[in-house]
A protein has these predicted regions:
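Cytoplasmic juxtamembrane regions at transmembrane-helix boundaries
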Residues: 101-115, 241, 249, 440-450
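Hydrophobic alpha-helical membrane-insertion segments
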Residues: 37-52, 169-179, 379, 418, ...
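Cytoplasmic/organellar membrane-interface segments at the starts of transmembrane helices
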Residues: 369-372, 424-490
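Alpha-helical transmembrane segments and their helix-start/interface "positive-inside/aromatic belt" motifs
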Residues: 29-40, 161-171, 369-373, 449-457
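Hydrophobic transmembrane alpha-helices and their helix-loop junctions in integral membrane proteins
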Residues: 97-105, 121-133, 147-430
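Short phosphate-coordinating micro-motif centered on Lys-Gly-acidic
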Residues: 140
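Transmembrane helix-loop-helix hairpins at membrane boundaries of multipass inner-membrane proteins
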Residues: 1-5, 19-114, 192-200, 481-486
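Central hydrophobic cores of alpha-helical transmembrane segments in multi-pass inner-membrane proteins
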Residues: 7-22, 37-49, 88-102, 119-121, ...
Length: 490
């Protein structure tokens, strides 16, 4: 019997949560050390799964399956393929770096880390779930703590509004996707929620065309798809730093991944039929998000709308149903997750020192926070899709897939590259270069060593994937084969 490594990854955060809650509230150091140890274990095991995956064999690996509610066809069924293994690693990395950056949090750290780790368990669970009921169960576990993390520890000006807005959008999306999932369960006649069994269910073309929008859009709301995206920037801005990192870095990928795994893979004919309007919606995401980001003066809103734009590329890559587009989207989920975690970490560090996010009021921060400035420049180069960084490895195949699908769409989407470069350069020049405003002289200091370690880990990954794409692309390609075989190698 193989070691249940995926279950250990999924439930390590919950185990840490229970341990953390045993500490008295005044024992903050023990809470932080326990949280960091649990996050490191989860990241280490996630990396083990990632590098141990047998690319030659492909398919689902590290599979565990146990009966849960057999009368209803519900089982605890988990496994990873070439698309989900990078996302498990992504979650582990963001979890670990988020704990490092939250080390100085003094407002109820015990409860903060408990809710953050419940969120992490939900995210891990969705990425490894091979049972629809389990996927929905973990999906809700991931969404629930977001409300509390934002409403309690978020930016006081908008935290209650943002938390409620986020919760309402995601709750409505969950209900819509639940309708589609239940329709598939009853229509299949198989009496099971097992996704591998449902891949072979003989759903009629008409049924797939009707149900696909429920499933896909229900999950894609969490992925920030237009026009259901405007909860996302507000949520980013109100959330504390580690939660923003999780929100943009991981949670939005959860929505896109579930839309692929459940919508596209279980209802392929429905996906094929609805491609035209999906491409248009995501094209709006890509171009509109970039233009809106370019006119923002709040540092965090720039990154928030940038995420909307980049997530549009992910879903657009899926919607092309081409090998290139799907590979690019798979890599982009990982690359964008690490990049936005880095961006929001930097924004949080600048805000902690300056107590403002208004770009016109900032400047010269690279003089006193050199590592922070360098980290943002690295993230900016990734965002612009520069060769040598992970963004290029992700975006180039997506645009190749778009060109194969429809050249004019690729050309319109390419406008976002120019706009992205313009606002990234604007932010770098105004926030990190120039002279340091007088009110900050003597009051702004460099970040801690733990912050630098977190930034270093994120930068190393972004550069590593860009310089040596073979560490990820062949793995993602094995997962893409699983998708394409459902479309007859489309």
């Amino acid at each position: 019997m193989q070691f249940p490594i995926l279950s250990v990854i999924v439930f390590t955060p919950i185990a840490a949560t229970m341990l953390i809650l045993l500490f008295p509230s005044e024992r903050k150091d023990e809470t932080r050390v326990t949280a960091l140890a649990a996050a490191f274990i989860a990241m280490f095991l996630s990396a083990w799964v990632y590098f141990s995956y047998d690319k030659a064999a492909g398919g689902y690996q590290f599979v565990e399956k146990y009966n849960w509610l057999p009368q209803l066809g519900i089982s605890y069924h988990v496994g990873v393929d070439g698309l989900s293994a990078p996302l498990v690693l992504l979650t582990g990395v963001v979890m670990f770096t988020g704990v490092l950056i939250s080390w100085g949090l003094d407002d109820r750290p015990r409860e903060f880390f408990a809710f953050l780790f419940i969120l992490a368990t939900g995210v891990f669970g969705v990425f490894v779930a091979l049972d629809l009921f389990g996927l929905l169960f973990f999906y809700e576990i991931a969404v629930f703590p977001m409300f509390l993390l934002i409403a309690i520890w978020g930016w006081k000006v908008t935290r209650e509004y943002a938390a409620m807005k986020l919760t309402l959008y995601l709750f409505i999306g969950s209900v819509i996707s639940l309708v589609g999932v239940l329709a598939m369960y009853f229509q299949s006649g198989l009496g099971t929620f097992d996704m591998l069994a449902l891949e072979n269910a003989n759903f009629s073309v008409e049924f797939q065309r009707i149900v696909f929008p429920f499933v896909f859009l229900g999950f894609a709301v969490l992925g920030g798809i237009f026009p259901f995206h405007n909860w996302s920037p507000d949520g980013h801005v109100a959330a504390p730093t580690a939660v923003s990192m999780f929100h943009a870095g991981v949670l939005m990928k959860l929505g896109a991944f579930a839309a692929l795994r459940v919508g596209i893979m279980l209802l392929p004919e429905g996906a094929r039929f609805h491609l035209p309007w999906l491409i248009i919606l995501t094209l709006v995401n890509v171009v509109y998000g970039a233009f809106i980001a370019s006119v923002q003066t709040d540092f965090k809103y720039v990154i928030g709308f940038s995420s909307v734009s980049h997530m549009g590329l992910v879903i657009m890559g899926f919607a092309t149903l081409t090998k290139e587009g799907l590979i690019g989207a798979g890599v982009q989920m990982f690359s964008h997750g690490i990049m936005t975690a880095l961006f929001f970490a930097v924004v949080g560090m600048v805000y902690d020192q300056a107590h403002t996010r208004e770009i016109p009021k900032l400047g010269g921060f690279i003089r006193v926070m050199p590592m922070v400035g360098i980290a943002f420049i690295v993230g900016g180069l990734v965002s612009m899709g520069m060769p040598g960084f992970s963004g290029f490895i992700a975006e180039f195949p997506i645009f190749m897939g778009l060109w194969r699908y429809q050249p004019w769409i690729a050309l319109v989407a390419a406008v976002s590259i120019v706009v992205t470069a313009s606002y990234i350069i604007r932010v770098i020049s105004r926030v990190f270069f120039g002279s340091l405003p007088e009110e900050f002289v003597g009051h702004v200091h460099d970040v801690t060593m733990l912050d630098k370690v977190a930034l270093g880990v994120l930068c190393f990954i972004l550069i590593g994937v860009g310089v040596y794409p073979a560490i990820m692309v062949p793995l993602v390609e094995t997962g893409v084969f699983n998708v394409l075989r459902l479309f007859g190698g489309a």
